[in-house]
């Protein structure tokens, strides 16, 4: 049974390596590279599978890198449908500097996707034999894809009776919100970009989330705050989660681990609070692993008791806004 259909339009081959020190001009001798299938929806599917959810991944691939991406997805054991592209799938590079512990991320532009290619992705969604509980769209839109693409996906999700979950930014975000989103998961930077204003404290984040809910009918807004945890707002809930303190090896994929864990718990019948707790633990667990290895289920279970969730009281919110 398919609980979750995950979609990404801009997948990648994620390559991670390390070097003693990053310096200009001279050759840098790197450690043996690790290769992972990457992109928002791909990573969400990888994590959801680790949490026992039935998942299907839909993604476009092209060229020799696209062939490698398919092999990497198959290696993860993810049921998938790949749409052929004329251009090459992109690659991303993460370099860990051993001397300082700094992480450098080089993100290459995605291939141009033609109208027939992105329409093929929509056709696959519309013709799904399964009726998923959730449809997750995550990641940026590559060149050639219109900003209302995720809005079209939202419409298909509604037709299939699936709850639509979105993690993206820019014009694609607002267009999709107007069509209808069940759960929105921005990070703080993405929330600020969407608002066109700087919000930082809990009260301002909650107020912004409530405005999104009131204006667009979104049911849940979860803002991930990295090492500072996360804030969840719905029509009747305002929760603040504190993240466990962990040693950061790589922050790549923490947000995708957060979302993958949350949706998989919801899709397998658990409560919103349980899903939120697992999401925060998964985000923390992801930074313990190298590159885009994402969270390990055993690490998530170990960190879970350290996640503290509390209701944000009206007085706290008023004080934060006043401050």
What kind of region is each of these model predictions?
Residues 1-58, 67-68, 313-323:
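Glycine-rich phosphate/adenosyl-contacting loop at the front of the ribokinase-like
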Residues 6-7, 59, 82, 136-137, ...:
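General beta-strand structural signal in soluble alpha/beta enzymes
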Residues 22-32, 105, 236-247:
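Glycine/charged-rich beta-loop-alpha catalytic/anionic-binding loops adjacent to active sites
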Residues 46, 93-95, 229-232:
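Short beta-strand scaffold segments in enzyme catalytic cores
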Residues 48, 187, 255:
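Short, conserved phosphate/pyrophosphate- and ester-handling motifs at nucleotide-, phospho-/glycolipid
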Residues 50-133, 302-323:
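Conserved N-terminal subdomain of the carbohydrate kinase-like
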Residues 133-205:
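Conserved beta-alpha-beta core of the PfkB/ribokinase-like small-molecule kinase fold
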Residues 155-159, 174, 178, 202-323:
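Conserved phosphate-binding/catalytic region of the ribokinase-like
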């Amino acid at each position: 049974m398919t609980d979750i259909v995950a979609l990404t339009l801009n997948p990648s081959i994620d390559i991670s390596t390390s070097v003693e020190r990053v310096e200009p001009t001279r050759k840098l001798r790197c450690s043996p590279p690790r290769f992972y299938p990457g992109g928002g929806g791909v990573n969400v599917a990888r994590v959801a599978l680790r949490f026992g959810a039935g998942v299907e991944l839909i993604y476009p691939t092209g060229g020799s890198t696209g062939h490698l991406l398919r092999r990497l997805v198959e290696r993860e054991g993810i049921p998938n449908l790949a749409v052929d592209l004329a251009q090459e799938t992109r690659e991303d590079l993460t370099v860990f500097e051993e001397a300082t512990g700094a992480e450098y991320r080089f993100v290459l532009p995605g291939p141009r996707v033609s109208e027939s290619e992105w329409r093929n992705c929509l056709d696959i969604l519309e013709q799904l034999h399964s009726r998923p509980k959730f449809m997750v769209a995550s990641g940026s839109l590559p060149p050639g894809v219109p900003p209302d693409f995720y809005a079209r996906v939202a419409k298909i999700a509604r037709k299939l009776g699936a709850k639509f979950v979105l993690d993206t930014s820019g014009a694609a975000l607002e267009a999709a919100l107007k069509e209808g989103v069940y759960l929105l998961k921005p990070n703080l930077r993405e929330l600020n970009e969407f608002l066109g204003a700087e919000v930082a404290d809990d009260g301002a984040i909650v107020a912004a989330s409530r405005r999104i809910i009131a204006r667009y009918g979104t049911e849940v807004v979860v803002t991930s705050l990295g090492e500072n945890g996360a804030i969840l707002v719905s029509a009747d809930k305002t929760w603040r989660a504190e993240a466990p303190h962990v040693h950061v090896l790589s922050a790549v994929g923490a947000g995708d681990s957060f979302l993958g864990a949350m949706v998989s718990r919801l899709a397998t019948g658990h409560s919103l609070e349980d899903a939120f707790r697992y999401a925060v633990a998964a985000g923390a667990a992801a930074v313990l692993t190298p590159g885009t290895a994402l969270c390990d289920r055993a690490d998530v279970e170990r960190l879970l008791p350290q996640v503290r969730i509390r209701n944000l009281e009206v007085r706290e919110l008023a004080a934060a806004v006043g401050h």
